Amino acid sequence: MKLPRNILVIYRLAVRGCAAMAICLVLAGAAAASPIDNEKTRNKALKALRAGDFEKAEKIYRDLLAKDEKDLDSRLGLSHALLKERRLQDSFDHAARAIASDPLSAQAHALLGSVVLATGDFHLSVEEFRTALSLNPDQAMAIAGLAMIDFYENRTGACVAGLRRAISIDPDEPDYFFDLGQAAARLKRYKEAADAYERFLVIAPRTDENRRARLLGWIDFLRYLGQQGDLYSLGGAERSVLPFDAVDYRPIIKVRINGGKELRFVLDTGSGMSVLSEETARKVGVRAVARGGYALAVGGGGRFEIVYGYLTSIDVGEVHIENVPVYIRHFYEEREPVDGYLGISALGRLITTVDYGARRLTLNRQRSSERADLATVINRPGKNDNSAPTEARPGVEVPMRTTSSGFLSGEVAIEGIQRPLNFIFDTGATTTVLSEKLAALDEAQGFIQKGRMRVVGAAGIAENVKMALLPKLAVGTYTRQNIDAAVLDLEPVNETSGFQQSGILGGNFLRYFRVVFDFQRGIVRLEPLESSTVLNENAPRPEATTPRR
């Protein structure tokens, strides 16, 4: 409901008056306990926070609070430092205490919103950001927070506008420039993205050399992309149907890159950008065009060098995709070797249907003038299309968010866990994954099994990985019982995802469905298969393979 302008003015004056009164009361009560030296000490803490020395800032703020627990500015500073350290529970506690002390603190509400957004609670974060803006319409952290919600929920244009406004209010906060770089890159505004990242490097702390090296390599790659043609330009058929293998529950298709011979690629919705193996890159003559830093990942040493390449084209069935950026890295697969992974960005303009029962992949070109009916789009004919129609099935459409890293995240429910959880929907993962943090909760202890498993990750092989058995795993209105899951540290994923992921929905769950991906609208449709099309549940479980970050 929109209030009349005169009522809004009265409301804002009342809020400002209450805020002024609250500030006077706080100052009057704390004057004796807040000497001038405390202000100098807080400035030192703020300087440490800006310099990226979060531990030093935390210590200073804790010392100040030990002297005066009613020091609101120090409590807000401590919450902010803990947020930067990704100690989300502690950060939440101090932001909540600040609100209890001063309910009219816009900064406290903005901080609380930022913390709960990082945990993946979108509904509460929106409430807190809006409360902050009702108290102070120019609260930059709240403006940036709402902009990032737009980013995750695929309203990227609105995100860019919000971040630009936040930067105009607080041009010294490096995170806003970093986020703007991400949003601009998603909109294919590569020059603006590179400029934003370069500004971030100017004002950001120099404490994390690997992150700076990653960004310098990414900026070089963005500059390179800005000189190329339209990325992911589509040609060929409007609709293409092709078979896939699924020996380990991952859809493995045959593609051609740069017009060459057929190669084996995994269809990987757990990767934003496509990936090419080092060996295949050498064979087909694809060279690095930029590189820099190391990416954190599962397995081995926990990281791998970031190397960027560029493909003139990829042919998937009768669909032709031109100008495709890729990562180039070493692959560790032993039992089911592949040449690459086809990521979300390459498929972004295609409605992609993965039928695990028929082992058939259907690609339909997205028509910008329509909102596709995902229940029938699989049978929409293309020109000269003689393929047999597919049986219509009931299903449920699940809204997706897109993480900062570019992969799909949806809400799932696990019996015994009281809150909804954010899971990555990943066709490139053999098995479902439960994060170590979630597995450590008291209510999850009954899930843990005695057995161990071997996991192949982007950074190598992890041995003796804990296993869990999820009693009931639900997505939308559909539930599967007794789903095996690997228990893995997902912090490498969460450091770059923007909001917390509690697990990965892998092939051992998705194989029970026909799955339709509408990447542009951020929707996944799940259609349960008939029992006759479900793979044998008593078959040997394959080696687990996790997403290629």
What are these regions (language model features)?
Residues 33-39, 43, 55-59, 63, ...:
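Pepsin/retropepsin-fold aspartyl endopeptidases
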Residues 49:
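Polysaccharide-binding and catalytic clefts of secreted carbohydrate-active enzymes
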